[in-house]
Amino acid sequence: MTSRLQVIQGDITQLSVDAIVNAANASLMGGGGVDGAIHRAAGPALLDACKLIRQQQGECQTGHAVITPAGKLSAKAVIHTVGPVWRGGEHQEAELLEEAYRNCLLLAEANHFRSIAFPAISTGVYGYPRAQAAEIAVRTVSDFITRYALPEQVYFVCYDEETARLYARLLTQQGDDPA
């Protein structure tokens, strides 16, 4: 049986999955890192959809997630989530990061998505230590997929080889084949 969890090193904007997750900022207006890359690749339709969400419900709070069409991307949808800014680990960062992953998965399940791709949420400009963030990501996603049939396939998309090895090691430790 193939694992429902896989690690990919590469560009999340190039994946043909039901949903890609955007590590967004609260404004949903694009930014640096993966957020900027997703907005550039998706084109202006993504920004328009994000503006509409802001008009309807305001900013996206830390740990929350919202869904938009994917614009020019191969994915069906983009799920935007706001991870926590690392402030030393004493400000509920772990709980908020777990909540961000779980809320993305709940949106994917509610929309009957079979596949979802996650970047390493909060590990860029938000400064979350990669190893700790990866442990939370793998644990949260693993717990979720034991309880829900969807999504059937979850990809951890890592920009660099070091992060990909970190995720692969964590999946191997829990008995999953990350390839």
From Swiss-Prot:
GO terms for biological process: purine nucleoside metabolic process. Substrate binds at residues 11-12, 25, 33-35, 122-126. The keyword Transmembrane helix does not apply. CDD domains: Macro_OAADPr_deacetylase. The keyword Plastid does not apply. GO terms for molecular function: O-acetyl-ADP-ribose deacetylase activity; purine nucleoside binding; ribonuclease inhibitor activity. The active site is at residue 35. InterPro entries: Macro_dom, Macro_dom-like, O-Ac-ADP-ribose_deAcase. Pfam families: Macro (PF01661). SUPFAM superfamilies: Macro domain-like (SSF52949). It catalyses: 3''-O-acetyl-ADP-D-ribose + H2O = ADP-D-ribose + acetate + H(+); 2''-O-acetyl-ADP-D-ribose + H2O = ADP-D-ribose + acetate + H(+). Residues 1-175 form the Macro domain. Keywords: Hydrolase. It comes from the Bacteria. Its EC number is 3.1.1.106. Belongs to the MacroD-type family. YmdB subfamily. Deacetylates O-acetyl-ADP ribose to yield ADP-ribose and free acetate. Down-regulates ribonuclease 3 (RNase III) activity. Acts by interacting directly with the region of the ribonuclease that is required for dimerization/activation. NCBIfam families: PRK00431.1-1, PRK00431.1-6. Homodimer. Interacts with RNase III. This is O-acetyl-ADP-ribose deacetylase. It comes from Salmonella newport (strain SL254). The gene is ymdB.
